[in-house]
From Swiss-Prot:
Keywords: ATP-binding, Ligase, Nucleotide-binding. This is Putative glutamate--cysteine ligase 2. GO terms for biological process: modified amino acid biosynthetic process. Disulfide bonds: none annotated. GO terms for molecular function: ATP binding; glutamate-cysteine ligase activity. It comes from the Bacteria. ATP-dependent carboxylate-amine ligase which exhibits weak glutamate--cysteine ligase activity. It is an enzyme of class 6 (ligase). It catalyses: L-cysteine + L-glutamate + ATP = gamma-L-glutamyl-L-cysteine + ADP + phosphate + H(+).
């Protein structure tokens, strides 16, 4: 299959996808209710879409094309409200977070869809272990070459995205010591990691054609890169975020991406180089392991500094662009959390420290996700 034409999209437009957990309200373990949820949700007129994911205890929601983070919040809130009301009817709950803290991967069921069955046959147990939950942010690019430039500029900020969204400290009932353990599961797949260093669509097409000739890939969907071009949408898709515990934080992360993209497209602040990737995996590991306490190695200078400081410095640098795209509130929310050394991984650990019961932590996380939606479950 040849590479798709890169479609036009409005520069800096946004789209957000969230993979969410479905849990029972007895012991708050994952529950295979995706099909029932989809049946209920498809009766409700909503923006965006609600679709199944790899295993039947997951569901993915997505916005339509949005021009601002406030529009993202409006759409996510509307879908969230419908989700939790549908879940109430089934006596289950919907939860954010990058991993379920104590689910056992071997108990998962692959959702009955041809692509998921094909992936399960190819990847074996990895498919069930892929019951992890991420946020993807699409940002519109005016043309294909701009998309690749933006992708490689954005790669310097992968640690920032990981630390700000980290919400997966627990796996199989254990504290992993990672703020984002979810991304360790992604690395197991052979076509994960980072995109090849190509700054023009012609060069990228050469790479893609070579890969398809090997028979290893058939389409862009086969690449699990941290950031990948999405030619059919005219976007790049950033895929390293853990799903946050609230739609408000998910929106703030999208606003941060949009502000960075505005800075890149309007000021061309630096030219990415292949050498940017010398420290890429190290920076990525630091952010996964230590979150906001990570060390950041500047790809341009080789200098070391606390990631927290680099995040705050970046936010100050892009504040004007955030204001211009209407993402000032998003930046403020994230800035405040960084100053308090506060991310969702910390919240989960603090709750577990108080409760000493991961099921209760999930119950509280479910309450947090639903926001102000009144509970409609029957007694």
């Amino acid at each position: 299959m040849s590479l798709e034409v890169f479609h036009k999209s409005a520069a800096l437009s946004l789209g957000v996808e969230l993979e969410l957990q479905l849990v029972n309200t007895h012991d708050y373990d994952l529950a295979p209710y995706a099909e029932d949820m989809l049946r209920l949700m498809h009766k409700i007129p909503l923006p965006g879409s609600v679709v199944p994911e790899m295993t039947s205890s997951m569901i993915e929601i997505s916005t339509g094309v949005c021009s601002s983070s406030s529009e993202v919040l409006g759409q996510l809130s509307q879908i969230r409200d419908a989700l939790v009301k549908s879940a109430d009817k089934l006596n289950i709950a919907v939860v954010g977070g990058g991993t379920h803290p104590f689910q056992q991967w071997h108990e998962r069921r692959i959702y009955d869809k041809p692509r998921f069955r094909e992936l399960s046959e190819l990847y074996g147990y990895l498919s069930k272990q892929f019951t992890i939950f991420g946020q993807h942010v699409h940002v519109g690019c005016p043309n294909a070459d701009s998309a690749l430039l933006t992708l490689h500029r954005m790669s310097r900020y992968i640690p920032h995205f990981i630390a700000l969204s980290a919400s997966s400290p627990y796996v199989q009932g254990q504290d992993t010591a990672f703020d984002s353990a979810r991304l360790n599961s992604v690395f197991a797949f052979p076509l994960s990691g980072r995109a090849p260093f190509a700054l023009t669509w012609d060069d990228f097409k050469v790479y893609f054609d070579k890969m398809t000739r090997t028979g290893v890939v058939k389409s862009m969907k086969d690449f699990y890169w941290d950031i990948r071009p999405k030619p059919e949408f005219g976007t790049i898709e950033i895929r390293v975020f853990d799903t946050p515990l609230t739609v408000e934080r998910a929106t703030a992360l999208a606003g941060f991406v949009q502000s960075l993209a505005s800075w890149f497209m309007n000021e061309q602040p630096f030219m990415p180089t292949e050498d940017d990737y010398l420290v890429y995996t190290y920076n990525r590991f630091q952010a996964c392991r230590f979150g906001l306490d990570a060390v950041y190695v500047d790809p341009a200078t080789g200098g070391h500094m606390p990631l927290r400081e680099h995040i705050l410095m970046t936010m100050e640098r892009i504040a004007r662009h955030a204001g211009a795209v209407g993402a000032g509130a998003s930046l403020h929310l994230l800035q405040t959390s960084v100053e308090r050394s506060d991310n969702d991984a910390r919240w989960l650990r603090e709750k577990q420290g108080e409760e000493r019961l991961l099921a209760e932590v999930i119950r509280q996380a479910a309450q947090r996700f639903r926001g102000g939606v009144t509970h409609t479950q029957l007694p």
